[in-house]
């Protein structure tokens, strides 16, 4: 075996869904083999967990409500560009939303919950509740949390292009036949 480092989370090729429980299931085997696995050591997840731990230790007696906000104010100068691996980003943004409240996971339709949030130095941006993997580890490791949500910003042009990609079937993750060849649309895109 070997040690393992993951900046995000495992996501199966055939399902637009991910969760830490799949990787946490390996903990005892890694420990027995004397191996280390570090999950979620990117920015979100990763730095977001460090910020939460720092706030819990230095600023609060307990954390009850946690909203993580991810605002990308960048401009690629293109009509449609993702800020992460395009396939993973499209899968992440088009799946159902999920957040934690009162000991339960609440599932929403994609982009169902949104509002304008003010970001210092950037201004107001429309922000959407999406599911992001660090919510799982944060509610597990900070049991006083009553509600945890992850918000991400998207411009209307981005969302319009995303809807077109979905409507023409290019966000699909199941194989289709194209000119006698089997392809999976989203990686082909």
What annotation goes with each model-predicted range?
Residues 58-189:
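C-terminal catalytic/substrate-binding lobe primarily of soluble NAD(P)-dependent oxidoreductases
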Residues 20, 42-45, 49, 128-132:
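Short-chain dehydrogenase/reductase
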Residues 7-36:
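Rossmann-fold NAD(P)-binding glycine/threonine-rich loop
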Residues 8, 15, 40-44, 127:
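Glycine- and other small-residue-rich loops at beta-strand/loop junctions that grip anionic moieties
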Residues 26-73:
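Adenosine-phosphate binding glycine-rich loop
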Residues 1, 34, 144-147:
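A generic structural signal for alpha->beta connector loops
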């Amino acid at each position: 075996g070997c040690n393992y480092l993951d900046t995000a989370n495992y996501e199966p090729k055939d399902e637009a869904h991910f969760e830490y429980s799949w990787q946490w299931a390996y903990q005892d085997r890694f420990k027995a083999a004397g191996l280390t696995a570090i999950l979620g050591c990117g920015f979100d997840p990763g730095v977001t967990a460090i910020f939460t731990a720092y706030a819990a230790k230095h600023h609060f007696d307990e954390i009850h409500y946690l909203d993580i906000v991810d605002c990308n104010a960048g401009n690629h100068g293109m009509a449609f560009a993702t800020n992460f691996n395009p396939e993973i980003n499209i899968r992440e943004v088009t799946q159902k939303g999920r957040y934690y409240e009162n000991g339960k996971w609440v599932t929403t339709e994609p982009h169902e919950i949104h509002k304008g949030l003010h970001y210092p130095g950037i201004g107001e941006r429309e922000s959407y509740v999406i599911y992001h993997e660090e919510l799982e580890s944060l509610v597990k490791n900070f049991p006083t949390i009553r509600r945890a949500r992850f918000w991400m910003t998207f411009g209307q042009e981005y969302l319009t292009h995303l809807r077109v990609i979905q409507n023409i079937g290019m966000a699909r993750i199941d194989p289709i036949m194209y000119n006698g060849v089997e392809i999976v649309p989203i990686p082909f895109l």
